[in-house]
């Protein structure tokens, strides 16, 4: 249970153990007592069950201050459960910092005890389409793509969609109506995921203002940070949670790495909701094909493409070719006669071929005019130089 005291957590643990065991359990005073009760109950099942699954969701929430939860868990696992061949212990936790530092990075008894880490990736476009169809929602692929550009591939968000309404109506109800379910999700998300949520939000909100991303040094300077340790941890956590990506601009070494915000829900929230005191409850329905909608769509579609590099490579017939992914930008310098140019996506292949990709959002097949083709060829020549 989120943000409850140790005593409240222990009381709920006792209730659940009573429910599953069918026997009234005394309320434990410590986590050591709680795990001792769990051990006693599981011992009665060892001979009659081929497999026993212990599943604890949101494990970090149990580790309240001075609770000794992690040490009690250590004793339970190393002192007994790990020796039982038919017991599997599965834990989940959205608090990335805790899971990384306290469980995966534990220097005590839980060190190197993890059998396997499970990465729950968001749905891709195809999986999103199949999920929506399973809910009886039959939209065009353009509508599915726009839905993805707003919510990403997060099943929890996609499951909120009501098949009785159109995509714009659903977005209005979920984001802009009074009491909308996703209107405050951003604040809760960061508080539950990260211990120092303020720093993480500052980083994300800064990166949201820079389309191409920022270097580590630029972020430190903009946020007036004097120590790089916390920033490194924050970057790593944000990357592991799929909020941002780290990439190199073509031709630059790792020390010039860029950090870019790529989480689609966050990009949408920061663009249309955060800081807006008054919001039209039908904003999205009324914004269709507006200049603001078109500008957002272009950038969001670029991020959608970056979420589907494997699918792009497959379509190009190079899925099995080792590839580095870059972007590239050259700033204009009139004094030196240097033209400005930018390439959204570069696939630098092991077979000594480089694909230069332009990402364009369009409601219909994009028509490459002779003038636009010439522009692309000129950009290619600038890149070659």
Predicted regions and their residues:
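A cross-kingdom feature that marks ATP-driven nucleic-acid transaction machinery
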Residues: 250, 257-385
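Phosphate-binding site recognition
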Residues: 1-286, 291
